[in-house]
């Protein structure tokens, strides 16, 4: 059955499983980088607690770099696919070339921040000189060699735009394997490689990213024959750049909100480095679980969008129903694992002084996974039905408008000694449940306006 016929005729429940599994695996793989780094760093013989705290503080910048790279790639992907569909190979070459030009600009900004901005950034979140030193070392390496993750994101979308997503997954696997192999060698010092500690973790990460980017560059040059390649096509075209960001900017904003939320939470938890570290470690576990929902969302959106395009009310309704059911099943599994085995995760990271805070955070915040997963599914449904504004509203509620003021208010009671740190963790389930209620109202409205009117 051809891809078009599958989207038209295959039962939606089977289609969602078939499309969702590869995307879920791909998204889960992206979360491996952060978990692997923290696990190996947490088991360093000396300074592991400070190193884990440092990794927690640098994480928002890493997320922001990825957000800008992926958002630019999303805009490139959509514009390139549309241009190729129109048969305009020359414009397609310019789109690809301009995306690479933008990649260079993004890298230059990251490089300059890595040289001049890391001290001020780390110092804004801690006064511990050991944590500042480790955070600066790690973040400087990640920023100065950030061309790996930036160009991986762009080449990934260039391959996906021409239907070659399998090759981008291969690149992800290679990068993850390289990172996992190099982490213990460079962190602990094995064979002729000296012990480098937290710097070794940074080098292992960026080498894995560069390996992925290099492999995807080769795939791009060898396989993407639908349009020409060449330095000449990198000449900036303001019209094309505007088109790329007209599509990609909402994706950048949505991803950047996550970075802002983590940074502000680090500031709120500044009174307790152990609580900061616990939150950072838990966030990486949470990201792994929620990335399962993100992967399924990437199947929900095209299935419902295709059905919307063919005016099939039944397939839209099936897409919404099965998308929510499968998301809830995934999140129930995630909640079960994190509620039953918090101690195992603490051992994986060798959480040390942060152990009690980490287990407390896991037991409370993981309650929110089901509501968070539903919110992610809602956003995929909105996007499929041209509801970009509704999707942005949910992002703002979850990552800015509710969570940060609530956590800030709760932290006042904690700092005054009236309540324990666990009070701050309750801000997450409250936020996700509230956003889920708003999301349900928005879903009813968008179904009434966009779906019920279909013939």
Predicted segments, located by residue:
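N-terminal transmembrane alpha-helices
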Residues: 7-39, 43-47, 60-75, 79, ...
